[in-house]
Structures are given as structure tokens and as C-alpha cells.
Amino acid sequence: MHSREVSSVREDYREKDMARTTFNIGCLVVLLGTIAYTQQAPEPASAMTTTAIKFLDTLNDEQESAARFAFDSEDRFDWHFIPRERKGVPLKTMTSSQRSAALDLVRSGLSEDGFTKAESIRQLEQILFELEGRDIRDPDLYFFMVFGEPGDGNTWGWRYEGHHLSQNWTIVNGTAVAASPQFFGTNPAEVRDGPKRGQRVLGSEEDQARSLLASLNASQRASAMLSDEAPRDILTSSEREVAMLDDLGVSQSDLTSSQQAILWSIIEEYATAQPATVANQRLDEVREAGLTNIKFGWMGGAERGEPHYYRIQGPTFLIEYDNTQGNANHVHSVWRDFRGDFGRDLLAMHYRRFQHDEPVNAGE
């Protein structure tokens, strides 16, 4: 065979090998994409429904009776974050398998970071017990309440709550999720002794706000500083429904691009305690209502260790953070949705849609 013919044959083989390689890589990409898709976590509503059913199935009759409430029960709105007597079924009465199912339910309602915060807050109760010796300080005094009947296409809700923790979810039509009020608190805000010394469960919420405050120029700071004295607690407390607070603070539109980025990062810190789908929905609503309508306000001292409070408020939402009690080592923080706490906006849309059709399936 002549050298020119040999060269031509080799070129043909080279082209065929390249084609086979390209085809194989393409198949691999498709395969990996398929695997990634099939391994994606289920949507929050579906995940919560599945894990709630599994959790309820683990309970005995007495526990299930304590955990279940009608969807239209007034108890659904009776949320709080202080160490008080609560309804529901507590971790304290659960077996190890029941506890595992209960915490799986919490995982389904929060992001990984949100779940870590919730568990860290619960474990702080052990530190308080060691400091105070009071039985009310107990990491097992966290309660579960289920409102209505979890199921595909159903409207129902649930709450996970104890000292410094209140997470409230409403699932409408088995698909839409509302996840507020959302409360996280810490005492101590910074652990100063023992094996967990230096732990600051809500440290990012404070540090980023301080970074924003420190970046303000004199004019911006004059708008942002609402008072030299911080309130003793978040202003909305545990109210069932909240309206906008005074429209005060420095406006997002008056911030530089780098300051706006810090402000948005703080908002994300609170929003992303929820699963990605819910968090993105929250953030989309914030954007749609207009970023320039958001204001940041500060009360109290600007130095670390001084009592302080801040809030971030837009047309649809309110973030409050207060650290005044316990020598400014005791944090309360909350995300409120003016229209959507306890799923009010989702339920209103649902009822309007079905006003002349079938009644809502709330598992009654």
C-alpha cells in the first residue's frame, strides 16, 4: 500500500475514534444528568408530607392524640418562643425511632444550614441547664403539632417549637409552602465557657449587620440609626399577624453597590434557613416588591457587647434581630411575612379559586 493510502486509512480510523469518543462522552453526560435528576431531593411539600406521615405512623395512640389538631384550630396561630408549657408531642416522650422520624420531619422543612441552626439552638438548652439547674431548660422539651391531614393534594400544616425556636409551615393543595413565622433565638448568643466555648449559632446574622452599619457614611448612618437605645425585644413579639413597622431606616437605593450586596446577603441568611425552593420563592417575592423599597434600621450601641437591635423591612417582609438581654448575649430573630404568615396569602388564593367548586381538602 502506498504511503498516501496508508495515511488516508489512518485518518479514517482517527475520525472514527474521535466520533466514538464524542458519542461516549455524550452518553456519559446524559447518564450523569439523569442520575443527578433522579437523585434530586423531592420538593419541600412532598418531602414534608411523606415524612409527616411516617412520623405520625410511629406514634402510639396517646402521642398521636397529643400531636394532631384540626387545620382550622386556633392553636395553629398560638406560637411563641419563650420556655412555657406547650401543646403537642415532645421529643422527651419519644423512643429513639420516633425521635429519628421526628427529626427527619424537621430536616424536610429546613435547609441543611437551617437544620444545623435549629439543632444547635436546641442543644443550648443543655448549657442553660448546667448554668441554672432548672428543669425547664431541657433540649428534649421541643414539641411537634400537626394541623389537618398530611396527604397528596391536601392542605395542612405543622409546627416545631420550643425555647428560642418556632418554625411554622403551611402546605396548600399539597404543593405550595408557606414557612413563617420563622423564629431563631440563642442564649447564650456566644458560649463563653466549656467545650463549646466560642460557639455563636447566629453569629452571621450579627456580623453581617455590623459590617453594613460600619460601612455607612455620616448621611447614611443618620438615616439608619433609629434610636440610641435598643428595645428589650423584637417589636412584633409573637403576634399572630403583623403589619409594617414605621417606614424608617436607610433605603437600599441610598446604599453603594457593595453595601447593597451586604444587605442582600443578610436577607439571604434568613431566607435560606428554608429549603431552596421555599427560599427562592421568598427572595423572588422580595425582588418583585422592589429592592429600592427595603430599609435597614439600627437601634442601640454600635460596639460589640452593647445592647443592639436591627430590622430590615420591605413591602412584603420583616426581619427583626434583638440582642439586649443577658448583658447583650441573648438573641431573638424572626422573619415575618406581612401577607403570608401561616399561609394566609396562599389560602386566600386557594379559597377564591375553589369558592364555587369543591371545598378545600384540609383532612377534616
Regions found by a protein language model. Give the residues of each.
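Short, Lys/Arg-enriched N-terminal segments with co-localized hydrophobic residues
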Residues: 5-17
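Bacterial N-terminal signal peptides that target proteins for export
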Residues: 15-26
